[in-house]
């Protein structure tokens, strides 16, 4: 049987001599493999342009490479799960920054100034009982 025309073919990538790092943001977890290459970025087997539709997500994803002035020197393979697209981009940026430090430790001060190596610990606050939301109470009636 031939592959159905609706399903894209699975891309096989050779990342044997690559650096591995994980990034996290909100409930998203990104596993990053980074190697010297030509600037290809794959997210869950798709090109990042196909995976992320919004322009600000694409710009945010390329930010670590623009900061170190080497946007096309690395290939990235990423498996990301959990959360929404914004959280996934944040997790990927965190992971890419950590993987770049494995290639060159001198980049640490540059990436740290831009706060890319720091885990953003903000997440959704839980809903409390007796409240409508995490902090919003029910409407108060005096009488």
Predicted segments with their positions:
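Intrinsically disordered, compositionally biased charged tails
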Residues: 1-17
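Structured, basic alpha/beta domains of bacterial-type, RNA-associated proteins
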Residues: 12-24, 30-72, 77-81, 86, ...
């Amino acid at each position: 049987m031939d592959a159905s025309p609706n399903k894209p073919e699975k891309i096989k990538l050779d990342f044997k001599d690559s650096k591995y790092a994980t990034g996290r943001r909100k409930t998203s977890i990104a596993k990053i493999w980074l190697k010297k290459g030509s600037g290809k970025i794959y997210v869950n087997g798709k090109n990042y342009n196909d995976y992320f539709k919004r322009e600000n997500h694409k710009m945010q994803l390329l930010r670590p490479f623009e900061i170190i002035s080497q946007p096309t020197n690395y290939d990235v393979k990423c498996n990301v799960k959990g959360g929404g697209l914004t959280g996934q981009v944040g997790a990927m940026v965190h992971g890419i920054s950590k993987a770049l430090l494995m290639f060159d430790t001198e980049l640490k001060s540059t990436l740290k100034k831009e706060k890319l190596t720091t885990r953003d610990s903000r997440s959704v606050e839980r809903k409390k009982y007796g409240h409508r939301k995490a902090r919003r109470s029910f409407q108060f009636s005096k009488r």
